[in-house]
């Protein structure tokens, strides 16, 4: 039998054909860590006893979870990264003011490219599969070993093939697509499998694809990956500073399952507490009052997400009972939002606008929920206590639904505030 897209990339790195279930050790093209995971990896790296990293251009250290530092402990975490970057001359250390949320920043900087094998000490590293590369999250010890050796080990995954048909309706985005899929297959529906997206992918922008690949892990997947097409090429061409290789799936590749997704059938989705699989169409939500809305994150903090929020919020006001927090995913996106007048409209509407940070998403800072509070967020997880108090609630939705709901004071379709 032929190979899936993921298996093709892993086979190329292994120098031979690999099979699902096989354990392999291969070279990596990028190793990533953030201000939570990298300090642990650095501590383990120092125990190995090597005097240099495998390649100072293939390591990315991105402080993003608690930046700007919220307290002494978080400041010390970033300082560990800073000192390590100086000691080993790490080229891709992104200091505060030049940083962004890691999974938006690395593609923007051209650091992850088609055909790459990318590991990151963060579960949403799977985001980069939007660019037709194999990207997956690992633990800090694996990150440490990879910084020393340039290698990582994997079990080759089986794959589920998602064949997309039709087109997105008005106010429907990649966030709605992935919530719809997770609602169908469940949070363990792709456990340790590759979610491979093909068919009418041209109906999805590159930002839609980043969002979908980002949340592959929420279905338990090892990785998410899209076919390479002209949309991928247009994005990569502007950013790539090195050569890359495009891989294609074999026509006779074997999949554990083939699932057809008709995009025409998808309405805006909302995931209810406390799992991303608890999805409902916006038409089935009912009147759910909210206290806070968060628009941003590695899932939905890109320029197109900011544009959607701007279109809905322009000339309107955030409901007096709602706090709206907006954080563009990178400094580059933030600056472009300033140039386009988005930030001005957000502030006029009554939103708080933040520099790039993961803070609210993990209940870290800049938007922590109190007991009994309810948030609607464009983030990727709504587990118990994810954004604050264990008796708070988090609902997940797209930027369009989030912006509209901030105006209404309860969860609504964007059509209701147009």
Swiss-Prot record:
Pathway annotation: Amino-acid biosynthesis; L-leucine biosynthesis; L-leucine from 3-methyl-2-oxobutanoate: step 2/4
Ordered alphabetically, the record's keywords are: 4Fe-4S, Amino-acid biosynthesis, Branched-chain amino acid biosynthesis, Iron, Iron-sulfur, Leucine biosynthesis, Lyase, Metal-binding
Query: Superkingdom of the source?
Result: Bacteria
The reaction(s) catalysed by this protein are:
(2R,3S)-3-isopropylmalate = (2S)-2-isopropylmalate
Q: Does the keyword Iron apply?
A: yes
Q: Please list the GO biological process terms of this entry.
A: L-leucine biosynthetic process
Q: Please name the InterPro entries in this protein's record.
A: Acnase/IPM_dHydase_lsu_aba_1/3, Acoase/IPM_deHydtase_lsu_aba, Aconitase_4Fe-4S_BS, Aconitase_4Fe-4S_dom, HAcnase/IPMdehydase_lsu_prok, Homoacnase/IPMdehydase_lsu, IPM_dehydratase_rel_enz, IPMI_cat
**Which major enzyme category is it?**
lyase
According to its UniProt record, the EC number is 4.2.1.33
Question: How the cofactor binds, per note?
Answer: Binds 1 [4Fe-4S] cluster per subunit.
Q: Which Gene3D superfamilies match?
A: Aconitase, domain 3 (3.30.499.10)
Name the cofactor(s) required for activity, per the record: [4Fe-4S] cluster
Q: Can you tell me which residues bind [4Fe-4S] cluster?
A: 298, 358, 361
For this UniProt entry, the molecular function terms from Gene Ontology, in alphabetical order, are: 3-isopropylmalate dehydratase activity; 4 iron, 4 sulfur cluster binding; metal ion binding
Q: What does this protein do?
A: Catalyzes the isomerization between 2-isopropylmalate and 3-isopropylmalate, via the formation of 2-isopropylmaleate.
Instruction: Cite the record's note on assembly.
Output: Heterodimer of LeuC and LeuD.
PANTHER family, A to Z? 3-ISOPROPYLMALATE DEHYDRATASE LARGE SUBUNIT 2, HOMOACONITASE, MITOCHONDRIAL-RELATED
Give the protein family.
Belongs to the aconitase/IPM isomerase family. LeuC type 2 subfamily.
What is the name of this protein? 3-isopropylmalate dehydratase large subunit
Q: What is the lineage of its organism?
A: Bacteria, Bacillati, Bacillota, Clostridia, Thermoanaerobacterales
